[in-house]
Design a protein with these regions (language model features):
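Active-site rim beta-loop-alpha module in soluble metabolic enzymes
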Residues: 141-187
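Glycine/charged-rich beta-loop-alpha catalytic/anionic-binding loops adjacent to active sites
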Residues: 67-76, 180-186, 228
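Glycine-rich beta-alpha junction loops
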Residues: 36, 109, 168-173, 198, ...
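His/Asp/Glu-rich mid-to-C-terminal helical/loop segments that flank catalytic regions of hydrolases
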Residues: 220-234
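A C-terminal functional module that forms or caps the active site or interfaces directly
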Residues: 179-211, 215-219
Length: 234
């Protein structure tokens, strides 16, 4: 069996999430997800909130917070980086909190600085250069980010600068080679990150909704890498 032929929807998993958590809960439907400790700290400082539970990991618990904004109950948590970890945590966060709509944003590398400079980036499709998505959907080069147009509508409504394009999701941050970058650019990719294709695959599988966008950080457009805004927070 080829390594990419890992999608098995003919038999059931041996590990069920109910083995790890006593009860399934519902607190709110919409959950905001950030990858930034700085954003988490700002959230805790500026919004009245309470922890409604956590996802357990060997690195320590990931707290899930409930808060209200404009009389609507919302959830928030800080996700680990990478498609494999972030997708597993999302599934467990759903079980702990009841969330099915996930607003996920974070930084990305820029493959086309002319198109992306000073703009938010809305992925239309994600190149599946990671492992987890192949366990949740049939093999393909790209997965469609199905709520792309909804993000576009919101950004247009509030006159936010943005660009729409394909994104490259990778597990191998230190193997973003010149040839790979050029190939992804030829296919229409404007950004590179580490989560979106995996998150979209798991959302498709479980019937969740993903709303994702990025802000530019480092630049991989050309022969040399530029740190640019890497490490900057939004």
């Amino acid at each position: 069996m080829s390594i990419i032929d890992s999608f098995d929807n003919k038999s059931k998993p041996l590990i069920d999430i109910s083995f790890l958590y006593d009860e399934k809960h519902f607190y709110a439907d919409v959950c905001i997800v950030s990858f930034s400790r700085h954003v988490l700290d700002m959230f805790l400082e500026n919004f009245e909130n309470k922890s409604i539970g956590h996802v357990g990991t060997s690195n320590g618990p990931i707290e899930i917070y409930l808060f209200e904004f404009e009389r609507k109950k919302l959830l928030f948590y800080m996700s680990p980086i990478g498609a494999s970890a972030s997708s597993a945590i999302m599934y467990e966060a759903h079980y702990v909190s009841g969330a099915t709509k996930f607003i996920v944003y974070g930084s990305c590398g820029v493959l086309d600085k002319d198109k992306c400079s000073g703009k938010l980036i809305v992925p239309s499709h994600s190149y599946r250069d990671e492992g987890v998505s192949y366990h949740y959907m049939a093999p393909s080069d790209y997965v469609k980010i199905k709520n792309c147009n909804k993000i576009v509508d919101i950004f247009q409504k509030y006159n936010l600068p943005f660009v729409v394009g394909k994104s490259w999701t990778t597990d191998a941050v230190y193997m973003e080679t010149q040839n790979k970058v050029q190939k992804r650019k030829e296919e229409g990719c404007v950004s590179v990150e580490m989560e979106s294709s995996g998150l979209q695959a798991i959302c498709n599988y479980y019937g969740f909704e993903l709303y994702t966008f990025f802000f530019p950080a480092d630049i991989l457009d050309g022969d040399l890498w530029s740190k640019a805004n890497l490490g900057g927070e939004i």
